[in-house]
Amino acid sequence: MKATTLTIMATRGEDQDLVQQTAVSLSAKKSQSTTDRVVPCFGWHPWFSHQILDDTAQPTAAQSPAEHKSTHYAAVLAPSPADDQPFIDLLPVPKPLSELISETRNRLQQFPNALVGEVGLDRAFRLPSPWTPTDIDNRDDQLTPGSREGRRLSNYRVKPEHQRTVLKAQLQLAGEMNRAVSLHSVQAHGGIFEVLKELWAGHERVVLSRRKRDKQRDAEGAVSGDDEGDDEDKTPIGSQSTKSSDPDGKSYPPFPPRICMHSYTGSVEPIRQFLHPSNPSDKVGDVIKALPEDRILIESDLHVAGAQMDELLEDVARQACQLRGWELRHGVQVLADNWRRFVFG
């Protein structure tokens, strides 16, 4: 394997501990290099968000565990499976959201460079059909449980509002811990933007028009010069203090410091919305061309490490360089610098 560091995402209950164990194991065996072999990422993917119970909502009437489980899934899935008890019976007992956030916080504290991910919104996916006895007998035991593994899809989807609740809690944790986030977004770019907008409300930058900038310079007795340098004209407003669990005791805004739009497949327009100056921070080809140079990351998005992963990383790096008109050595250096800045700040 040529890649020196793996950024490994957790997605569901079955792989949080596996990512943690892998990071511990490889970090213990690393050489004198200052870069860890693994950057672990902890989060709950939207495909599994139905397994999370929002215990921050109004308490429900006293129910048995079985009734509580049925009520939860009937509320968060669409269409409601209230009349499909066999389907509900085969779903796992939901995990309280507060428990997920507490566990993720502990894992982030263990790994100072860990990220939050993979999290997000997905309006397209459907839950797979329950396991049949034949499916169980024929499944590959080498695979981590919890994924689809070829099962047919059901008609059930997770309601967008429930996905938003699970996502928002994890983004708030990322802000609290000052960690970058890997975001999954399928047919939900507007929803992602709205969640982020809610989190950074009161922290927007003020973007002055040219006329107001000139008036401000004149009022300050400054010599009117070049109109460029927008970054110097952006003035943060609103309180920047929030409670933080970061070991250094610092307080951070209630939103992630850095976000990667993982495998972005939307159009250029939503990206322009995300990159608007007021924010505190072919179709794919158009997006790569439209992005600022320091906002491009590449990935293999592969479930195994090795030669195939290296080949995919090389292929996508070459494509990015070709689209941007970069000389290969320069482009690879840009992409490497972007990754280090995204992960380590």
Residue ranges and their predicted role:
Residues V19, P40, E118, A174, ...:
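Conserved, mostly hydrophobic/aromatic
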Residues M1-H50, A114-L115, A180, R258:
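Divalent metal-dependent hydrolysis catalytic cores, especially in the metallo-beta-lactamase
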Residues D294-M309:
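Short acidic/histidine-rich active-site segments
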Residues L312-G345:
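Mid-to-C-terminal alpha-helical segments outside catalytic/metal-binding sites
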Residues A10-D15, F48-L53, D84-E99, S281-D286:
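Active-site glycine- and acidic-residue-rich loops that bind
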Residues M1, P86-P277, A305:
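Divalent metal-binding pocket/active-site signature
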Residues W44, H50-L90, F125-Y156, L312-A317:
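Active-site gating loops and adjacent loop-to-helix segments of metal-dependent hydrolytic enzymes
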Residues Q20-R37, E103-A114, F274-N279, V287-P292:
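Acidic (Asp/Glu)-rich catalytic clusters
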